[in-house]
């Protein structure tokens, strides 16, 4: 039998069966190791901030401004101006952000990769990115795709006569798709299995359907009901961190420009980029309708031009919204849209490609919602009557949209960073006094250890302060000491009564030190909370026979209540923290999967997660002083007992109820009860990869390594939000 023409590799034409195929519910640790240095083509030590700061931003903007009206034959510009197209590109890059877990957003240039590059709502944006490639090519590593996409949106607005609020660089590109983001359970584009009950949207999702950035512009599931659309809009934009005023400003501001595309039936449109043929070179949605571009373009299927000034900032969106009575119609592609009743407004908007030809203004169901909903209507009418207020609101909302996932202002780069400090940035005052030195830190540790507070209390408080950090949107963390403020001080997971006691003692020590210090030296409570936690770790390590100093870098500030948005901060409350063996309620997602999610948000690797679990259990950080997972008779001593006893084959484990949430471990020989455990505890002996890690730390020769690795992982969490210092 001839083998001619056969692929020599088994993974050629067919994909082999994977572990995920065999065990679809298997715990996925890969999300803890994504975006590794092996995937990054930049040189070791490449400093993007340094590269960006060497950039001539004015020159980049000049090149982008010239590009706006340099229409290309391969993808001509509507109205001779790419500005509206680029606004949509930037909007859709940033608009995937959701507050529930801080994931999505413009921060890593993920629009370049699947699935976002092939979402139905992103149809055509493959061309937008190709149009700005010459600019990216010219400036290379000095500006990331993530920054360039947002900057291009800003320049587009400015080139159309709008004054933006500012721009900050600092978004570093990733080089592979995010694997940690849950976009929904649906397996079909535009499906909406994410709803339950009375249209209750699944957490943490924000978009209404798979493959949409926010809402269906035709109305819920294509039903052209403006009031129902308003309900979806309010829910979705709230989950994008926008209030009603910001929502109206963004929709009306964005729809001041450009048009949608629905020249023909969607059956003419070819596959999305990820499914397109090789020769299309990463471009998708190739259309067989006419020329497939310009006036023949098919995108959403809607054919809408909102204003008479589609390439110029104006108040015409509201003029049209309130100036006409609207009736339902359909686009050439059959999509629901709206036009003025009785033929009003005919010839009031320009055609995008035929000079002198005029059209009737049109609106989306999601636009009419701004008039139908009473609250949105009041805001819209106020903006209509006060165009300067509208412009200011849109400028601020656009800046928030495109910068929401960047974290604190210390990460902002470039000459156009606004000087104004905004509440949604979670501002923290920068210390303006001399910092404590090593001698001071040693003295403070001694005071803390003599205060009567236990190791468990010290470590628990520091963890509560630091573990709010989310690597997704760079929010939370120990800096600011917001653990002492609402809402964090009242979260069940933080054990409010114990927390108040610890903070009272630490607050008194802070006052005592600051009064006695000379030369203006001060210690912030944020720093002291971490110092106290470090002291607890060091004492516990010493009790286990290992002398070690936990690294500490001063410089944290203390945020005030006025600098803290309680509602915005509330989204950081964990529904689960496996590191403290805590579940806020009963969930369909197993506790061990919630642990992996928490570890990923903390930017921890699987070994770091493992060693932290083992250490925190024996240090006594469980919420409510639960005994689950405390596999030691030497509590508050930093031993590897958790792993040694977890791996002991002399223990037999059984669930304590049909819920399979809690377990008891009994001596195989005597039946005597030895330990209690949660799902989070037992997964470190059950899951093959986690067991392999546990075996490292449960070995006879691992005690010192265990302590060293715990201290390293602990310090990483304590410093996770310290963007003011260089991380190794």
From Swiss-Prot:
InterPro entries: Catalase_peroxidase, Haem_peroxidase, Haem_peroxidase_sf, Peroxidases_AS, Peroxidases_heam-ligand_BS. Its cofactor is heme b. There is a cross-link at residues 214-240 (Tryptophyl-tyrosyl-methioninium (Tyr-Met) (with W-91)). Keywords: Heme, Hydrogen peroxide, Iron, Metal-binding, Oxidoreductase, Peroxidase. The record marks 88 as: Transition state stabilizer. Formation of the three residue Trp-Tyr-Met cross-link is important for the catalase, but not the peroxidase activity of the enzyme. It catalyses: H2O2 + AH2 = A + 2 H2O; 2 H2O2 = O2 + 2 H2O. The active site is at 92 (proton acceptor). One of its GO terms (biological process) is cellular response to hydrogen peroxide. It comes from the Bacteria. The keyword Oxidoreductase applies. Residues 1-20, 335-355 are annotated as: Disordered. This is Catalase-peroxidase 2. The lineage of its organism: Bacteria, Pseudomonadati, Pseudomonadota, Betaproteobacteria, Burkholderiales.
